[in-house]
Amino acid sequence: MRMLLHLSLLALGASYMYAIPTEIPTSALVKETLTLLSTHRTLLIGNETLRIPVPVHKHHQLCTEEIFQGIGTLESQTLQGGTVERLFKNLSLIKKYIDGQKKKCGEERRRVNQFLDYLQEFLGVMNTEWIIES
């Protein structure tokens, strides 16, 4: 009986893995998620009493933890089912992608020259893509 339970759980896990498309390019996943968000915006706004913290500044890449905490709050307060479930599944996949990318932020020591090149690129992005507040 116990072996049957283990095999059932293994089969369930395997079917779950194959049910989630892992080969979708992230850009396509983000586009689909934006479409789903637009489609379900009215449903998601339904709870007018719910308050979710929103980061003050516009540098979204610095606030991923806060954004995903807000998504978790919204998900826990939203009735699941249908395509809204797909929205939250996509957001979960995007979070996994971002978490994987964050792991690339460290762990490798390089020469000072390589660090300075990276720093210069970082400051260039800040200069062109960020809204710098006075």
Curated annotation (Swiss-Prot):
Leader sequence segment: 1-19
Coiled-coil stretches noted in the UniProt entry, renumbered to this chain: none
Compartments (UniProt record): Secreted
GO molecular function, one term: cytokine activity
UniProt superkingdom: Eukaryota
Annotated glycosylation sites: 22, 47, 90
InterPro entries per record: 4_helix_cytokine-like_core, IL-5
Keywords carried by this UniProt record: Cytokine, Disulfide bond, Glycoprotein, Growth factor, Secreted, Signal
Family the entry assigns: Belongs to the IL-5 family.
Self-association and partners: Homodimer; disulfide-linked. Interacts with IL5RA. Interacts with CSF2RB.
Function, in words: Homodimeric cytokine expressed predominantly by T-lymphocytes and NK cells that plays an important role in the survival, differentiation, and chemotaxis of eosinophils. Also acts on activated and resting B-cells to induce immunoglobulin production, growth, and differentiation. Mechanistically, exerts its biological effects through a receptor composed of IL5RA subunit and the cytokine receptor common subunit beta/CSF2RB.
Protein name in UniProt: Interleukin-5
Source species: Cercocebus atys (Sooty mangabey)
